């Protein structure tokens, strides 16, 4: 089970990578968008890992036997929770007047950042 310090560290790294991906690939430069991405990419993994801690769900931490992409259900959950959190926050917040594909791309890039950090960095 991950300690709270590790969860916070991983979520902070997720937020940083999500902001970089959204700024570089998604070409979003608005401070409001980038702050929202950081908040969502931090909050999603924290929420998911809090659920895993509260339920002592250790079986979610088994990595797939794929050396180049050893993803686990825990990693996947962090990405999915970040994606969902970002879709809601961005869609109701700073990107509410943008086309849905821009909201979806920004949320997807943020979720991807959370997934990659989870798989490779903690």
Regions found by a protein language model. Name each.
Residues 1-35, 39, 46-122:
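Juxtamembrane/disordered regions of integral membrane proteins
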């Amino acid at each position: 089970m991950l300690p709270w310090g590790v969860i916070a560290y991983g979520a902070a790294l997720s937020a940083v990578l999500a902001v970089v991906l959204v700024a570089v690939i998604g070409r979003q430069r608005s401070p409001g968008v980038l702050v929202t991405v950081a908040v969502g990419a931090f909050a999603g993994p924290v929420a998911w890992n809090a659920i895993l801690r509260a339920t002592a769900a250790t079986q979610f931490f088994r990595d797939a036997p794929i050396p180049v992409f050893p993803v686990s259900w825990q990693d996947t959950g962090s990405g999915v929770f970040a994606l969902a959190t970002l879709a809601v926050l961005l869609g109701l917040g700073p990107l509410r007047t943008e086309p849905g594909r821009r909201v979806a791309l920004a949320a997807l890039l943020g979720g991807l950042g959370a997934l990659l950090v989870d798989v490779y960095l903690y």
